[in-house]
Every structure is written in C-alpha cells, then in structure tokens.
C-alpha cells in the first residue's frame, strides 16, 4: 500500500470534523488508559481541583475506569528539602524534562527506559538531593498532576504560630509579591505586598519582612567591613 493512501492533503472546501462521536470515544479511551496506570488518591492530592488529568476526565465523561492498575507502585522521593517527586502520578508528558533542560539549563531529570517501563527520573534513579537540583520549583509549576510538587510545611507553620514561645517571621521575595496575584484573579504585574502583609499578620505572623530590606542591610554591613579593611591597610 502506497504512502499516498494514508495522506489527506489540504484542499479548498474540505470539512474536518474534530468532535464526532467516534473522536469523543477515542478521547475517552485515551484518558481511561492514562487513569488505569495512575494514582487515584485525588482527595488527598495536592493538585486536587487543579489537576489537568482530572479536568480532562470530567470533560470527556470518564466516570469509571474499566481497566485494572497493574503498574508497580514506585517509591516517593522526599529527599529534597523543597521538591517531592511521586512517580505514581506521572503521565509522561515531558513538561518537567523540557523545563529543567531547556529553560533552567540543568537537565536533572529525563526519560528512562522504553515502552511500558518508561518513566521520568534523575540519572541512575538517584534521589533528588544527590543531583544538581537547585530546588527552583519550575518542574513543579509545569507538572499537571502533582507527580512533582512543592514540599509543604503548612502544618509546621501552624504549629509555630499557635506556640506562644515562638516568634514567627515571614520574609517575602520580590518575585512573590507580584506573582502571587495570579492565583487570586489580580491583574498581572500588580504589586500585592500590602495585601500579603495584611493576610500574614491576620494569620498570626509576628513580623513580615521584604527581602529587599535584608539586601539593604547586607550592603550596609559589607560596606562597613570593606571600609574597615581599607582603614587597616
């Protein structure tokens, strides 16, 4: 059979149907197959309500998965102080691989093995803490299913706030005071520092600092040290 019989060349007045009953069935089957080898602990997942796979399942009408999950459960990597990697939630989209390599320039994680055994992992399946990972969190930002997520310390923070013997201080980085607004419908680029300070104080934080204030103190201290060295010479 020649190659031409498989091709559909573009032509005038050609109509392409992208949402027929058959196409809908194919989409539903693809999502079912993804879910069949996927962790289904949605209620306790950090991405619950924001998961791309969960949203697609609702959209295409997957109410039950007909296939059994025969995938071996992988160990969760919690070695990093900032990143948690759960291979059981990975759908092999490759977003984290491209982000780490092409944007961050580190290439800490990549695809390993082939076929049904394929997975995303650091070289030689090392724990993240033993790799060149800098904990930037960009892989977690692009991950659609919480296969890579930011390590949360919410419980520890609340325990510290409720302990009267502990003075709890928050420090806000310049990027955070602008980027945090995206999650609350605030126009992009708007400085939310005042809102952040108010919210943190209401929550129970004793003091809130801007990182730039610390930078000013550092410059002053280093200038003092530099002047002292010049005087001693």
Could you say what each language-model-derived stretch is?
Residues 2-135, 141, 148-149, 153-160, ...:
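Fe-S ferredoxin-like electron-transfer domains
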Residues 1-13, 23-27, 35, 150-233:
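Iron-sulfur-associated redox domains of electron-transfer enzymes in respiratory
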Residues 49, 61, 94, 105-107, ...:
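Residue-identity detector for glycine
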Residues 77-87, 145, 188-189, 208-214:
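Hydrophobic transmembrane alpha-helix bundles
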């Amino acid at each position: 059979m020649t190659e031409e019989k498989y091709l559909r060349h573009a032509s005038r007045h050609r109509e392409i149907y992208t949402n027929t009953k058959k196409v809908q069935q194919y989409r539903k089957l693809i999502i079912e197959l993804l879910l069949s080898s996927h962790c289904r602990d949605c209620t306790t997942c950090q991405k619950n309500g924001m998961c791309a796979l969960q949203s697609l399942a609702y959209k295409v009408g997957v109410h039950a998965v007909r296939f059994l999950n025969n995938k071996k459960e992988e160990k969760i990597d919690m070695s990093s102080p900032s990143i948690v990697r759960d291979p059981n939630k990975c759908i092999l989209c490759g977003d984290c691989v491209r982000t780490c390599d092409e944007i961050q320039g580190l290439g800490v994680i990549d695809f390993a093995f082939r076929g049904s055994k394929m997975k995303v992992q650091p070289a030689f399946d090392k724990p993240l803490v033993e790799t060149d990972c800098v904990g930037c969190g960009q892989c977690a930002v692009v991950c659609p299913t919480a296969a890579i997520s930011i390590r949360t310390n919410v419980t520890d923070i609340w325990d510290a706030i409720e302990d009267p013997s502990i003075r709890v201080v928050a420090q806000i980085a310049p990027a955070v005071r602008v980027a945090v607004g995206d999650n609350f419908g605030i126009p992009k680029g708007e400085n939310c520092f005042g809102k952040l300070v108010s919210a943190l104080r209401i929550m129970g934080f004793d003091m809130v600092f801007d990182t730039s204030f610390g930078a000013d103190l550092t410059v002053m201290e280093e200038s003092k040290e530099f002047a002292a060295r010049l005087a001693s010479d």
